[in-house]
């Protein structure tokens, strides 16, 4: 004699189906089914999706699409960590929980797979029969980047040949975990011309794949964030060039000469007719010395504001000051010339007894009087 389980209304039946995957693409999830004592009301509770080690096709295509949209924002001037954080955020908005490092690792593996597929295609007799997934998407990114920098002279009317695409990429024998790996275009002389990513972020994470851009003549060109901006699309600049900004004005300055020549070039570019000291500060607020080996990038021109003081003048017959003069000293030579033209040997702070023999002892905003 068999007794049905349905005859026991007080018994709860719980069924759990968990961690179901198909071909490694589906996201693992949990479904918990609960049955009440009456056997009529069912409740389905979905637990949060866990991040799978493998990427689904939708995830990968979304990552490639987002990376392609932001390709213009990747540059060689600073870290790209914030860009990968934006990509990770957009991935979450589309329902894919992927951290910035996971997105970067996946992108790096896609590039590695593309390189292998391209090598295999070159060995094939006609066109290559085995191609990676998303091959065309990655090739389109290279094609768009190549058009922007215009390093290849031939018109891009057809799909790039195997040799051209292969020359567009340069991989070392090192693994992708090596931070010094390059993924760049290579000219006939073997020098890379195009960088796909930038240097490591400040946390040391292997977010980008970096290489210095080099033109055909072996000299790195300046690469602005969006377009060259020189009136000729994709026309590279010869020599080492930095971008210097002062107020509302921006100039491109060559640094192939000596330190003194670079200073004179900056003075001429911004019409600095005084002998005021100046220096260059990069985007990380680091002051750089002026020489041909300084890093290429964007700089802000800082000019010495000098020391502004007030000097009171007396009449020979009247001990009271006649008037005050505001004076700004920029160099020790300016200070000495000011004293000599008035027949003074030094300055003394008003209502004080210490003589000021050199400019460094002056304090901005103070009132001084001349001493003979």
Curated annotation (Swiss-Prot):
BP terms from Gene Ontology: regulation of DNA-templated transcription
Boundaries of every Myb-like domain copy: 47-111
Primary localization: nucleus
Xref: Gene3D superfamilies: Homeodomain-like
GO cellular component: nucleus
Residues where Phosphoserine is found: 167
InterPro entries given in the database record: Myb_DNA-bind_4 (IPR044822), SANT/Myb (IPR001005)
Function of the protein: Probable transcription factor that binds specific DNA sequence.
Annotated PANTHER family: FI21293P1, TRIHELIX TRANSCRIPTION FACTOR GT-4
Protein name: Trihelix transcription factor GT-4
Organism: Arabidopsis thaliana (Mouse-ear cress)
